[in-house]
From Swiss-Prot:
The gene is murD. The keyword Hydrolase does not apply. Keywords: ATP-binding, Cell cycle, Cell division, Cell shape, Cell wall biogenesis/degradation, Cytoplasm, Ligase, Nucleotide-binding, Peptidoglycan synthesis. InterPro entries: Mur-like_cat_sf, Mur_ligase_C, Mur_ligase_C_dom_sf, Mur_ligase_cen, MurD. GO terms for cellular component: cytoplasm. Its EC number is 6.3.2.9. This is UDP-N-acetylmuramoylalanine--D-glutamate ligase. Its main location: cytoplasm. PANTHER family: UDP-N-ACETYLMURAMOYLALANINE--D-GLUTAMATE LIGASE (PTHR43692:SF1). It catalyses: UDP-N-acetyl-alpha-D-muramoyl-L-alanine + D-glutamate + ATP = UDP-N-acetyl-alpha-D-muramoyl-L-alanyl-D-glutamate + ADP + phosphate + H(+). One of its GO terms (biological process) is cell division.
Length: 438
């Protein structure tokens, strides 16, 4: 793809979070004339920042924070003036000379990105990991030296403003209807996701989930060489057979050696193995990672065994599909805490997944819908409360030794918490309080 020239261009950075600060510094470094705007003037602006309240025809480019909606007046004005609107990912990748590996999808992006990054590092590949995983790509480009490889997690928000991306290996973990409040339609969401492969050529690779209904369509429209993974279909590239992971019929590792738990994590592992093998990572390096990596915080995170209950924090389960995967990960009786922001999802889709749930404690905006789903599933104990604190107290009371206590909200956190991370931290604090256990 042709790279954009930023030298002497007048650029407006919209949003002053970590990514805004990083792209501001990068744009200054490469010779742009940079201005900053935000919905409210930040209190931590750098001393040399030119803050403005609006955009006009004198600007050449607007770089927005990925999460800012396109309905904002400044963005609409920029588009009406034919000023390009991009995210910091595009600015950063225009400066990068090495190979890009990128992961997107509805769920599993962060775990899959982390696994691939660790596998590359275990094989002594010079790689930096960033993107939606927490480190802005622009921040990685501030260093005077560049790595051989960038391993990136990219959200639909980032991809929508990075139309020039061309990864050597693109991974799509899965595709559900997600972030419809931002994208408005499933079609718009899928178009944003397709951006990850839109400019790939026959010399590039696209890794797809065999069970995602949109995978075949993506493969048909992409020019890249497609590879599939599946925990159930042994006719694809990366699969599981008789308790062993294979890639193109080559034995990689026995599942008994893998320490990362969860049905959904098996798909993440298969996606990571596929990308790693395409890149040329050794089986030794792959095995080293899979026999030691226990998972990320808030993603079916084992909090511990407390009063003979095994407790899991799955605060990252911000949609129905993630909670479905979490519930499928256990054979033991489950005491489930769920609830959060109501985005209009049909929570009755969880009914078939409730077969091992012995008590359901719901809170937040979705509490009544979840209780209704639980009653339809025949759960004997369904309890509605207002807050997570009350839910944890009730779960302590209802759970019994030998059972699982699972916090998997099936909803975003924003009705009561700023993000899923803070929600998960609060859950762990409440659980570790020894009071209230029956």
């Amino acid at each position: 793809m042709d790279q954009m020239n930023y030298q002497n261009k007048k650029v407006l950075v919209y949003g002053w979070a970590r990514s805004g600060k990083a792209v501001y510094q990068l744009l200054k470094k490469i010779g742009a004339n940079v201005y900053v705007t935000a919905d409210e003037e930040p209190t931590d602006l750098f001393d040399d920042v030119n803050f403005v309240d609006d955009i006009d025809e004198s600007f050449d480019l607007l770089v927005k924070n990925p999460g800012i909606r396109y309905e904002k007046e400044i963005i609409k004005k920029a588009l009406n003036l034919n000023i390009p609107v991009i995210t910091e990912v595009q600015v950063a990748l225009d400066q990068f000379k090495g190979e890009v590996l990128a992961v997107t999808g509805s769920n599993g992006k962060t775990t899959t990105t982390t696994l691939i990054g660790k596998m590359l590092k275990a094989d002594n590949v010079d790689v930096k990991v960033g993107g939606n995983i927490g480190i802005p790509v622009s921040e990685l480009m501030l260093s005077d030296s560049q790595p051989r490889v960038l391993m990136l997690e990219l959200s639909s928000f980032q991809l929508l403003g990075a139309q020039n991306i061309k990864p050597k290996i693109a991974v799509i973990t899965n595709l559900f209807s997600s972030h419809i409040d931002f994208h408005h339609t499933r079609g718009n969401y899928l178009r944003a996701k397709f951006s990850i492969t839109q400019h790939q050529t026959k010399d590039d690779y696209l890794v797809l989930n065999d069970s995602s209904i949109d995978s075949k369509d993506f493969a048909k429209r992409s020019q890249a060489d497609d590879y599939y993974f599946s925990p159930t279909n042994t006719s694809v590239n990366t699969y599981v057979n008789d308790g062993t992971i294979y890639f193109d019929d080559e034995k990689i590792i026995d599942l008994s050696k893998v320490v990362l738990v969860g049905e959904h994590n098996l798909e993440n592992i298969l996606a990571a193995v596929t990308a790693a093998k395409i890149f040329g990572v050794s089986n030794r390096a792959i095995e080293k990672v899979l026999t030691s990596f226990k998972g990320l915080e808030h993603r079916l995170e084992a909090v511990g065994v407390i009063k003979e209950r095994t407790v899991y924090n799955d605060s990252k389960a911000t949609d129905i599909e993630a909670t479905q995967k979490a519930l499928a990960s256990f054979k033991e009786p489950i005491n489930l805490i769920a609830g959060g922001l109501d985005r209009g999802d049909d929570l009755n889709r969880l009914v078939p997944n409730f077969k091992n749930v012995v008590s359901l404690i719901t809170y937040g905006q979705t509490k009544n819908k979840l209780q209704s789903a639980g009653e339809k599933a025949g759960i004997k104990q369904t309890v509605v409360v207002d807050t997570l604190k009350e839910a944890v107290a009730k779960a302590k009371e209802l759970s019994r030794p030998g059972q699982v206590l699972l916090f998997s909200p099936a909803a975003a956190s924003w009705d009561q918490f700023p993000n899923f991370e803070i929600r998960g931290e609060e859950f762990k604090k409440m659980i570790k309080n020894r009071e209230g256990w029956s």
